[in-house]
Amino acid sequence: MAVVRVVGAGYACLMSSRTIRILDLFAGAGGLTAGFHEASDRFRSVAAVELDPAAAASYSATFAKTDVFTGPIQDWLARADMPADVDVVVGGPPCQGFSALGKRDAADERNSLWRQYAEVLTHVRPGYFVVENVPAFGRSRQYQDFLTATRPGGFLEDYALEHRVLNAADYGAPQVRKRTVVIGHRRDLEAPGFPEATHAPEAAGGLLPYRTVGEALLGVPAVPDMDGRFDEVRTRVGDRELPGAFSPRELHFSRAYRPISRERFAAIPEGGSRADLPDELKAPCWRRHTTGSMDVMGRLRADRPSVTIRTEFFKPEKGRYLHPTEHRAITHYEAALLQGFPDSHRFIGSRTAIARQIGNAVPIPLGAAIARRLLEVL
């Protein structure tokens, strides 16, 4: 195995240059893999599994050397030709069944997808694995079942795991996004622990200040300038042609708004929301109900990280997604920047499908921080 001698401040150590092979489950458009690739060119995605054809196509377009399976993970498991010599398995099983967003459903079949993830571990036997999910996952029955499987007599007894809720803003993402991160390791290997925060609300103790919306969007044209591009490029996916593949920059297109919407946007100050609207611009339901989320039709602040970027960020009525200074929602490009996607990433699909890929992704800086932590033991 090749090694590289690294000389630091007063010390020298040996660091392996061996390729670290990644298997990405429930891969989406590849946000978590992108974070690993950003952390080190030692990481290489060798296989990925994704149900959604558009997201799988985006993954393939970005990581051209990866074997991407499009379909249910159960079908992939039935093929019995899993990749060999996998070092790290990563992935985020769909979380809607135990998400804090909306009603939780203990019977939701998506809650059992962690079992398919765990079954993959028994087949490929990686040294390490990472599961990313909503904050509620660590308090769920599903996580407890996962933990029980690692105890003596369990089908994952050769592994140990622990979890923490991490905030992407603490690792350099210009976005407040809290996620449960589970990191597991084979018991014969060193436990990696969790990445230390690199950023804080204010610079102190060696930590950098949070990255802001203004920093992330610096230099982005105020007026979206890619409206025509979306209809010009097509990629064949199965028996269909889908829009793409697009770089993030090519996703800076506009959305048509009604005159009343533009009036409302213009009346909302930076950091404000529908609560700041005069009565004549409020919808009847807003006048009747003064409680509820104040993020609805909210405007981002340029001097702070953004709120969590979700899948409908292009709809101001769905949250705090108005541009800090422009009278419009953030564009797909701006949302991708707030998620940390590099311009080398590629997206395929309808506008809605690409928004879903962006909003469902693990922020790249968070994935990179996890990857760098794993590098310390790999």
Write out the residue ranges for each language-model feature.
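Extreme N-terminal basic, low-complexity initiation segments
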Residues: 1-7
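Core alpha/beta nucleotide-donor-binding catalytic domains of modification enzymes
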Residues: 16-125, 135-148
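Short alpha-helical patches at coil-to-helix transitions and adjacent helical residues
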Residues: 29, 143, 179, 210, ...
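A short, structural micro-pattern
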Residues: 43, 174-176, 211, 303, ...
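Class I S-adenosyl-L-methionine
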Residues: 79-86, 98-288
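Short glycine-rich anion-binding loops that position phosphate/pyrophosphate groups of nucleotides
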Residues: 93-96, 187-188, 314
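C-terminal target-recognition/interaction regions appended to catalytic cores
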Residues: 237-378
